Structure formats: C-alpha cells, structure tokens
C-alpha cells in the first residue's frame, strides 16, 4: 500500500513554481529568484519533477523516523520504571542516572524531562522555591579548604523521624570526604567524618564551619591556669582543640549562604539518598552508614571537578597519631588514694595502674573506645564502682549512658576540656 504524505506550505509553493517552469510558464531564472535557489538547483528540481512528479518536492526525510527516536516499547518501559514506588520522589537528573546505571537505558536529560512532562510526571524540585546562592570561586587546591556541616532530614521512606547527616566536602574538587548519620547533630557524627577524611584523604589546611558551639565557644569562659600558662588567649571547644592538634585552621562562616558548596550538597543528597535507600531496602542508620561508605565513591566519580592546581594541600596523617584516642571527648580528673575518680555522679576505678593520689589524669570518651584513662601516654581501662565499699559493679549501662550523654547529647552544648 502506498503511503501518502501531505506537503507543507513551502513544499506546495516549490511544487507549483517548478510545475510552471516545466510547463514553460516560467523561466529557470524567474523560478530561481522566486524560490531563492540557484539556477543549477532549479534545473535539478525540474528533472526530478519530470521523472517523479510533485511528490519529489517533499523533503527527503519526510516519513523517516530519526535515528535517535526511541521506539514505543522502550518509552513505555521508561514510564513503567518511573511509576515504581521507589522512584516516586526521584528528580529527572537522578532518574536519568538510575536508568543508565540500573537498566542500561541511556537517554538525554532534555528528552527525559520533556517525555515525563508530556505524561504529567513532574520533578519534585519543580514545586520548590528557588534559593539564590551567591557563588564564589573555588579554592585552587584540593585540601585547601573543606566545608563541614550537618543536615536533619526524613531520609527513610515511611519513617517520619528526622535523622542528621554529617558531612565534609572539598571546596576545590567538590568531592565528599566524609558522610555519617546520627539521630542528632553531635560530636560522634563529626568524629566519624573526620576519621574518614583523615584516613582516605589526609589532613586539610582549613575547615569552614558554622558558628555552632561544637566548633566555637559562644561565651567568654574564664581560662584555666593550664591554658593561661600555655599562652592560650580564649577558650576552645573539644573539636577546636583536636583541630589545633592536627594543625587545621578552623574558620567560622558568617551564614549558611557562605557555605554554599555544602548547602548545595545537602539539596542533592536530600533527593538522591531517599531514593537510593528505597532501592537498596535501607531502613535504619546502621545500614545507611555502611551504604554511605561506598556511595561516597560513586558520588565523587560522578560529580567531582578538576581543581585549578593539580598539587594537593592535603598532607599525610602522621603514623604516630592514633585516631582512636585523638577523636574523643577529653576531661581532666583527679584520682583519689584508691585510683578512683568520678564522672557524671558515677565513680570509676582505673584498672592495673600504679598512681599517686591527687594525680591529674585525662579521661577519654568515644563510641569507638568507650571510657578510657590516658596517663603517661598509656591507656587504661576503667570499671564503675560502688561508692560505699569501693567494689566493682557490673553496670555496662552506666558506661553506655555516659558515652551517650557526652557524645550524642552534651556535645551539642558548649563543651570545654576541664
């Protein structure tokens, strides 16, 4: 069966003029002027008209499907995939990445956006108000400046509770150097992203942080005698003192807009992680933190940029640095004549130590090591004891409670080494 195609206005005009030329009612020169073609091309059109008739004036691609056009079955498959429950909150850019990675369907962003829009499927971002971020130039070297922050969000489908994602991002390359999720913004989260950064990338020159009391003191506390003798001019936070030990310059950001790099990262991860967690059936923080270790590599491979300077400002972590003792909350305590001390109304005895009464010790607290005592560069274990008879009591919940209070809760407040 012969397929007929309708001519558009230009093709109809061209056919009419060439017919006049063939019939002798118009010269080649007149046809050339009227159509804006060369006389040589008009002669070719005359020859084609004589041989094939008016249909030869149709464009050569008429009725031909473009090579890039997707077949109906593939379009339907894309729609079926998009309508799956785990993709109900995915934006267009992320969905394009998922199609390529998971289903081996490669389409352009513009096609996918228009195709979904025609089928009344809009990106979740379409309904949001656009935030204006004043961009500044990136630092020239990786490791020259890192931005640190935490963001609360409902990351798990069907769970209305908010969980806080802690993160570090390199300003020059846009690479994530650490991600860790906790219930609230806390020292534990910041300890873990620092551990990831120091191990996998090295020690950066500086870190850009907001004015949180985790990073900076918010009141003019009186200096301890030790601090005055050492020449310290103002109090420092637990996190700040760790940065000083590492030689990292901690810079205070004036506003959230000043940390634009990490604010944009949060916008991206709020969208993507919800979908990624649904796809991978992740429903709690422990599973999420395991997943995030590999997700950092995936994200960096896709989104990192090449810094202006190939030389890195990161320096290797000294082998002598023990991260398990460095990334801890530290408190000064004085022991009694039984090698005991108290912390948060709980008494502890230091195990296997020969120490004089009234000696000052460092108490180290973290999720990684629990509660330990550092004395003469050596770590000692401790046990909770009864105040009445100085006998050890098996109450691991006491230790867990103190760790939780100092690492997950108290460290949201202004905590100094005391």
Residue ranges of predicted features:
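Charged alpha-helix within mobile-element recombinases
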Residues: 232, 238-308, 314-325
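C-terminal, beta-rich DNA-binding module of retroviral/retroelements integrases
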Residues: 296-418
């Amino acid at each position: 069966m012969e397929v007929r195609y309708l001519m558009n206005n230009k093709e109809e005009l061209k056919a009419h003029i060439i017919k006049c030329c063939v019939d002798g009612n118009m010269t080649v020169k007149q046809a050339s002027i009227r159509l804006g073609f060369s006389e040589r091309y008009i002669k070719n059109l005359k020859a084609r008209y004589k041989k094939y008739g008016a249909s030869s004036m149709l464009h050569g691609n008429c009725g031909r499907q473009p090579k890039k056009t997707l077949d109906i079955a593939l379009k339907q498959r894309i729609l079926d995939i998009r309508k799956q429950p785990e993709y109900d909150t995915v934006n267009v850019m992320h969905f394009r990445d998922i199609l390529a990675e998971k289903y081996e369907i490669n389409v352009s962003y513009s096609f996918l956006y228009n195709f979904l829009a025609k089928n009344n499927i809009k990106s979740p971002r379409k309904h949001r108000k656009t935030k204006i971020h004043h961009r500044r130039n990136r630092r020239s070297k990786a490791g020259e400046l890192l931005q640190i922050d935490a963001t609360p969000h409902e990351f798990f489908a069907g769970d209305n509770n908010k969980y806080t994602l802690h993160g570090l991002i390199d300003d020059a390359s846009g690479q994530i150097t650490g991600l860790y999720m906790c219930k609230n913004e806390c020292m534990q989260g910041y300890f873990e992203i620092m551990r990831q950064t120091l191990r996998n990338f090295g020690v950066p020159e500086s870190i850009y942080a907001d004015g949180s009391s985790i990073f900076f003191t918010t009141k003019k506390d009186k200096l301890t005698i030790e601090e005055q003798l050492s020449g310290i001019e103002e109090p420092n936070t637990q996190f700040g003192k760790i940065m000083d030990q590492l030689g990292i310059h901690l810079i205070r950001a004036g506003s959230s807009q000043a940390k634009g790099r990490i604010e944009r990262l949060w916008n991206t991860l709020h969208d993507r992680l919800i979908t990624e967690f649904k796809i991978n059936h992740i429903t709690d923080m422990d599973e999420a933190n395991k997943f995030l270790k590999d997700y950092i590599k995936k994200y960096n491979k896709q989104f990192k940029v090449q810094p202006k300077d190939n030389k890195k400002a990161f320096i290797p972590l000294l082998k002598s640095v023990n991260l398990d003792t460095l990334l801890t909350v530290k408190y000064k305590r004085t022991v009694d004549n039984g090698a005991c001390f108290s912390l948060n109304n709980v008494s502890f005895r230091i195990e296997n130590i020969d120490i004089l009464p009234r000696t000052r010790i460092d108490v180290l607290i973290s999720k990684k090591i629990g509660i330990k005592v550092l004395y003469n560069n050596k770590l000692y274990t401790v046990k909770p004891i009864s105040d009445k008879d100085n006998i050890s009591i098996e109450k691991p919940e006491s230790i867990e409670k103190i760790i939780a209070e100092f690492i997950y809760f108290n460290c949201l407040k202004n905590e100094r080494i005391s």
